[in-house]
Amino acid sequence: MLKRHAVKIGLSLLMCLALPAPPSEAHLAKWGTWEITHRNLMKLFQDADPNAWRIKRYSFSEAEVKFLEAQLGFELYPEDKQPEFFIAQDKTGNFLGVAIFIDPRTKPKILDGGILTLEVGIGVNAAGKVNRIKVYDYRGNLELTQDAFLNQLRDRALDSNFTIGKAGLLGVAAEPEESQLVGNAAREALLLMKVALGRRE
């Protein structure tokens, strides 16, 4: 199994368990400070009340950890087992969704002598569907950060197909690996939501 580390996530409340998809090889991203986390939350939920973010902490049980590891194909580090959930609402108090930040690489990639980061923010609504998605501060092909690619992942649920080249998902031609990693991140976000806050039959 692959090892993974560091979690900081935000999830929603309603979800139904889906059929297994190909293992995501993503690991969860952790922003260094609340200021950075808040900045990136607001980029994802631009209509959120900046002063009304709520944080909910969760601890996965041993059974949930085993289920997640089986579905994802890698082991969770201790810090991954106690995620934080960031809940967004607008200025009138309406629920907007939740946010999760995932770094979908298990091995570093070098570009121009520096590490090429790939950090994905995913927003999920109360119906358990992706409704926001953003790639942060990416130094590779910027098509990966644009709506023409990212909007294909909107409205997909855990039982959707996240494989690039199938079910209407078209990757960025110059970055096939990164395109799939972004798709994997969206699927993992929904799975983590399901286990943490949903009902599993």
Where do the protein language model's features map onto the residues?
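Intrinsically disordered terminal and processing segments
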Residues: 2, 8, 16-119, 125-201
